[in-house]
């Protein structure tokens, strides 16, 4: 059964947050990024996402959740950045709080 965006977001949080060691875990969900196969999530250290501290930047893969399977996976960030099938829409109910 396909997962909703909200279910996918919680899967990502449950997968990454408990063992996060680089700064304070942050899932920036102000935008919903997706294509027909998966949701894309922006996670990282709050110190980088909010404060702009480059020493907390993480380079490499981007977490995704496969819609049909509900499985957390990853894709290279360059692949995600250049994938024309990925759509971006403002999230009407973000959990992200910048303050």
What are the language-model segments listed below?
Residues 17, 46, 75:
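Residue-level marker of positions within ordered structural domains that often coincide
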Residues 17, 68, 97-99:
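Helix-coil modules at protein/domain termini and other flexible surface or pore-lining loops
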Residues 59-89:
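A short, surface-exposed interaction/processing loop segment used at functional sites
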Residues 1-27:
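Short, non-transmembrane alpha-helical segments in secretory-pathway proteins
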Residues 26-67:
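Exposed beta-strand-loop-beta-strand "reactive/processing" segments of non-cytosolic proteins
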Residues 2, 76-79, 99:
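N-terminal targeting sequences that direct proteins away from the cytosol to non-cytosolic compartments
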Residues 88-99:
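Short, solvent-exposed cationic patches
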């Amino acid at each position: 059964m396909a997962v909703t965006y909200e279910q996918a977001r919680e899967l990502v949080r449950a997968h990454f947050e408990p063992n996060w060691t680089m700064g304070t875990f942050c899932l920036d969900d102000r935008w919903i990024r997706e294509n027909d196969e998966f949701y894309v999530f922006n996670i990282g250290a709050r110190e980088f996402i909010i404060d702009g501290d480059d020493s907390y930047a993480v380079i490499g893969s981007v977490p995704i959740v496969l819609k049909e399977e509900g499985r957390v996976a990853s894709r290279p960030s360059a692949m995600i950045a250049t994938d024309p099938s990925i759509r971006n829409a403002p999230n009407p109910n973000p959990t992200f709080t910048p303050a």
